[in-house]
From Swiss-Prot:
Subcellular location(s) of the protein: Cytoplasm; Nucleus, Nucleolus
Protein role: Binds to the 60S ribosomal subunit and prevents its association with the 40S ribosomal subunit to form the 80S initiation complex in the cytoplasm. Is also involved in ribosome biogenesis. Associates with pre-60S subunits in the nucleus and is involved in its nuclear export.
Statement: the UniProt record of this protein carries the keyword Hydrolase: no
UniProt organism field: Verticillium alfalfae (strain VaMs.102 / ATCC MYA-4576 / FGSC 10136)
Gene from which the chain derives: TIF6
InterPro entries given in the database record: eIF6
PTM text: Phosphorylation at Ser-174 and Ser-175 promotes nuclear export.
Swiss-Prot/TrEMBL GO biological process terms: cytosolic ribosome assembly; ribosomal large subunit biogenesis; ribosomal subunit export from nucleus
Organismal lineage: Eukaryota, Fungi, Dikarya, Ascomycota, Pezizomycotina
Name of this protein: Eukaryotic translation initiation factor 6
NCBIfam families assigned: eIF-6
Record family assignment: Belongs to the eIF-6 family.
Primary subcellular site in the record, as a coarse category: cytoplasm
Subunit structure: Monomer. Associates with the 60S ribosomal subunit.
Length: 246
């Protein structure tokens, strides 16, 4: 299922929300309909937490997480951390990270198996990502951009990358991640696909400006039209899917 939403006139859904297979975070704001889009699809399935991070509403750019964990910057307040711990399932590991590149959502893109990170991220941060999120970590660029989290959107089913990513880069990234990738855009031609949308294994939310063509590409590469609800996602299909996709 791919749906469109706006946060207070902004189409950058990935700036104001974080979505994984086990929880969702949305920014606190006057945009009740933004929250209700998530609520309509997710409320019976995974918890949705409305929060700020370090007093800021751009939570999608400040945090990075997957089914197993959530990483937040070091300037996240104690109250925010406690609120997250109270709202999310006990099994989710929540960890503050002391990292110079503190907009974690811009420098980390991850699914439940593999994370791609900014080439200059600190070694200690890399180890924390591997430990808390339970993933393999690779330093990468996307179309020569170091902000991998801004220019890529990733789930366990597929990925969308910056429209100018070369075929060779797409093939390399795809074999590394073991999921099919497509170069594309969101929000009527925006190349910041990571900031323009959020996705998990059964749902994507993009900006209101996203065209029907962009939406169909998103539904196709993330396999959202195939009735894969949270209960019947089979990650074992991954390898055969990659082979058949090419």
């Amino acid at each position: 299922m791919a749906v469109r939403a706006q946060f207070e006139n902004s189409n950058e859904v990935g700036v104001f929300a974080t979505l994984t297979n086990s929880y969702a975070l949305t920014a606190i704001g006057a945009s009740e309909n933004f929250y209700s889009v998530f609520e309509a699809e997710l409320q019976d399935v995974i918890p949705i937490c409305r929060t700020t991070i370090a007093g800021s509403r751009i939570i999608g750019r400040m945090t990075a997480g997957n089914r197993k964990g959530l990483l937040v910057p070091t300037n996240t307040t104690d109250q925010e951390l406690q609120h997250l711990r109270n709202s999310l399932p006990d099994a989710i590991r929540i960890q503050r990270i002391e990292e110079r590149l503190s907009a974690l959502g811009n420098v980390i893109v991850t699914n439940d198996h593999i994370a791609l990170v900014h080439p200059d991220i600190e070694r200690e941060t890399e180890e924390i990502i591997a430990d808390v999120l339970g993933v393999e970590v690779f330093r990468q660029t996307i179309a020569d951009n170091v902000l991998v989290g801004s220019y890529m959107s990733l789930s366990n089913q597929g990925g969308l990358v910056h429209p100018k990513t070369s075929i060779q880069d797409q093939d390399e990234l795809s074999s590394l991640l073991q999921v099919p990738l497509v170069a594309g855009s969101v929000n009527r031609g925006s190349n910041v696909v990571g900031a323009g949308m959020v996705v998990n294994d059964w749902m994507a939310v993009t900006g209101l400006d996203t065209t029907a063509t962009e939406l169909s590409v998103i539904e196709s590469v993330f396999r959202l039209g195939e009735g894969l609800g949270p209960s019947n996602i089979n990650t074992g299909m991954k390898d055969t899917m990659v082979e058949s996709f090419y």
